[in-house]
Amino acid sequence: LYDPEKSVHYLNLASTVAGLEDAIPVTSQLYELLKQQNIQLPVLADLRKLPYTKATEIYEYMYDQYWKKCTHRLLISLPPQRGFVRDLAVASGAAIVWLDARDWKENTVLRKFMKTMQPGESIITGWYAEERSGIGLATEYGLSTIPSDFYENTTVYAGMQQQIQYPEIPKMPALENKIYLALYMSDGDNVQYCQHAMSELWDKKGRGVIPINWTISPGLVDFGPGLLNHYYTTATPNDFFASGPSGMGYSLIYDAHNYLWNATSGTDFTPYAKLTQQYLEKSGLRVITIWDEVNQEQMGAYVRNCRYLYGLTQQDWERRPYKVPTYIQDHKLAFVPNLPCYANGVDVIYSFWRDTIAKFDGSHPIFLSAQGESWKMGPDNIVALKKRLEELSPGNIVICRGDHFFNLHNQANYLPFNLTLLPKMKITSSPTSTETKFAAD
């Protein structure tokens, strides 16, 4: 029993207790209605007796009395008034909190929960009062976040047991002295975007005409394998999927807006990189988009622990005194800047690329990458963008899938690349139960 009039945060406490006690959270009014219908249920916890009115007090009480009983593999960050993803918390015995990392008192309580979770095993789901402060605080403790505060029917989608049906990998084009461009659609780390807005973009005219790189959450392997299979089985050869930032769950290693490193050590970053590799294997994803940047120690952690990767992009928000360069880590793995990195339309991408493309002299291949804000662009806009770019350098524009982009980049720079993707490469094998076409991946 709880009283939302005393504080709405009692609903989160009641939901948490309900998950642990196999009970239901009920207000006084609803309790009376149940009794009127002769539904006599025992009261396992009467939270109305508690004297607390502040969020910090209520979640301190939750931490002291119930956190040790909760699973520490999952923490739900969710406004009390919101029902989405709450079913997952109750089903899994997870705690539900709503604390603002910008408020130092609430920040202190939130840290109590996070510091007792396990990097590389635990994740946070839901969302935060403010993006960068919340994601940044979780990153500080080696934790990543699956944005899901509007994800519907979580336990239904997560309860599906499905073998992931990986899309076939087409051959990449032959390397020439041309302009290779990769265009990424943002926000795929957000599983409710994958459930709703992405499906609307997916059905728009123009998809499949030219290569588009769709960011998607590797966490859908657990959160919604049916959703992942929907996109994989309806994809064209021009649809490529990349992991949203910055691997298994949203992690903000360097916050370029606030000039703040939330994590600096490659060693501390390793559990996240190892967790990411597990989900790259399960989801079949081989490119990651990073928000915002990582240092070279952390690049090394990706190289050592994420052996499936072809490459990664970083976000150049132009908040440095220099442009973010392309890094090649350990003579193997490329970290390429997205510039622009969160364009609010194709006109922005065109303006960033125009001069470089217009000055192209054909002496060697060049590689440019950009990420567009999914809410403000779609396949039809990208098709129109290609036509405009071709006018700047006729016959030289090659828009690429992400896997092709990084393999062509490595081939051009005499770095390791996947030979099976070469257009004239033929793959044969001795008798096997696996089709040889899968050797390309």
Q: Language-model features: where?
A:
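Substrate-binding cleft of extracellular glycoside hydrolase catalytic domains
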Residues: S217-Q278, K282-L285
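Preference for solvent-exposed, low-hydrophobicity sequence contexts
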Residues: L1-A158
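Active-site beta->alpha N-cap acidic-glycine motif
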Residues: E152-Y232
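Acidic (Asp/Glu)-rich catalytic clusters
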Residues: P173-L175, E200-R207, F223-S246, L280, ...
